[in-house]
Structures are given as structure tokens and as C-alpha cells.
Amino acid sequence: MKINVHAGHNPTGKVACGAVGLLDESTENRNVVKELKAILEAEGHIVYDCTCNNGTSVSDVINKIVAKSNANTVDLDISIHFNSGANDKIGNGKSCGTECLIYNTSNNKEVIAKRICANIAQLGFKNRGVKIRTDLSILKETKAPCILAE
């Protein structure tokens, strides 16, 4: 398979960086992208890192990721994020755990998203499941089927 992967948000310290608290989302999602890319390549997949590190706003970061992603002809697009967990160890019961967001259930996205959630949940995180989100540009505007993993 050919796969795009990207860390959501700008790097830490820049505008539009990710959640901070117990973990720093912008740092950790980049670590995950690096490891995920290496694992997928070791399995024989072609992987493109479409992370944006120089966005000037939230919309600019998203637009740059979408442009990089759409420049590649791939089978799947995966955006890596971390739920904020309400910025504490206990969380608020609403944003804690893992979930995958998809635009719709076509192109086998739901099946893959369920597998991602199940595998992350095996690490001890609450499995919040797969959710349809039609309002997120990253899911709407990428040409390839896209999964946003939280």
C-alpha cells in the first residue's frame, strides 16, 4: 500500500500547536509518525510524511497538510493526534482514550479505523470507537480515504 501519515498541528511553541498538559501533543504525535512510518516501511509499504512544521494559522496548517497529502497518489491517509484528556491524569470522561474519526464509512476506512482503536486500546486506553465527522477539513479534503486517530 501507499500511505500518507502526518502529525496534526504545528510544532510546539508555534501557532496552532497541539494540546499540552500531561503530554505535549505536537511532540508526541511527531514521534508516533516517525515510528509508524518506519514500521509500515519495514512491512513493505510506501509511506509519505505530510506533516506541516511551518503553518501560520490553524487553517494554514490544515491546508498545507491537505496539499502535501493530495500531491501523493495513495491508498490511505492517516492523521495522528492525541486527545487532550482534559489536561489532567483523571480526564473528564469525554476526551480520554482513543478514537478514530472518519468522514464516512466508504473505502474500508471504518474497518481500518476499528482495528486502529482496538490495537491502541490494548495498551490500556479506553476505546471510544469510530466516529463520523463531516466537519473536519482534513477528512473532507484529502483525496485518499482519511482516518484521524486520536
For each predicted feature, which ranges?
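Structural motif
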Residues: 76, 128, 145-146
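A broad, structure-centric signal for solvent-exposed, well-ordered loop/edge residues
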Residues: 12, 107-109, 137, 146
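Active-site-adjacent substrate-binding region
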Residues: 107-131
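A short, glycine/Asx- and small/polar-enriched loop/turn
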Residues: 72, 141-146
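Catalytic-core regions of hydrolytic enzymes
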Residues: 2-98, 103, 107
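Short catalytic/ligand-gating loop segments at beta-alpha or beta-beta junctions
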Residues: 54, 58-59, 122-142
